[in-house]
Amino acid sequence: MYKLVLIRHGESTWNLENRFTGWTDVELTPTGVSQAQQAGRLLKEGGYEFDIAYTSVLKRAIWTLWHALDQMDRTWLPVAHSWRLNERHYGALQGLNKGDMAKQYGDAQVLIWRRSYDTPPPALEADDPRGQRQDVRYAKLDAEQVPLTECLKDTVARVLPFWNDSIAPAILSGKRVLIAAHGNSIRAMVKYLDGISDADIVNLNIPNGVPLVYELDADLKPIRSYYLGDAEAVAKAAAAVANQGKA
């Protein structure tokens, strides 16, 4: 049996302000730092050990991973960064308040933008300063690989090659893997692992800063999965994520 641990980054400044974040590179709040540290403590108390960690190229996930590893006294672990683990790109919604958008367009439309599988938000213009095509961290990518908007289907399409080429081989080689990423890049992996339908994925919400453990069989099929920590607190945190897009 293999184990895989996924952690969504701790609360960010734009989570706190209820803004669509996407590829915008924002900081953790003090609460987010505490959540990341608590994740590390839970992993240490549970006796978890890791051989390699993966994260995105966005600092809210990078710092979450670092704070968790610091609590485990494992900051020396090798870490692989990939843009493929970035949050879903929210296009022209990036930086806008979710509640304000719900008041303007209705809760149902914002839910579609936030959670539907194949409906992307309105795209950014290519020269919009909120975009990332001039960002040095993406300089080696083709322009079309740096999105102007994404739906979850698009996110799955970029996450799965990294899973298949890097993460899955590491697990199968016996390495114990920790991934710190984002709500939608984790939803993409969970959808794939659990075989969640396109329709049902709308109901999946990933809480900030809570370790999600997968026990996998020899074919990397889930035996079971569970969050570490207090079940009631985890459920409340997931419900809070679900309510972010309401007026």
Swiss-Prot record:
GO terms for biological process: gluconeogenesis; glycolytic process. PROSITE patterns: PG_MUTASE (PS00175). It comes from the Bacteria. Pathway: Carbohydrate degradation; glycolysis; pyruvate from D-glyceraldehyde 3-phosphate: step 3/5. Catalyzes the interconversion of 2-phosphoglycerate and 3-phosphoglycerate. Homodimer. This is 2,3-bisphosphoglycerate-dependent phosphoglycerate mutase. It comes from Leptothrix cholodnii (strain ATCC 51168 / LMG 8142 / SP-6).
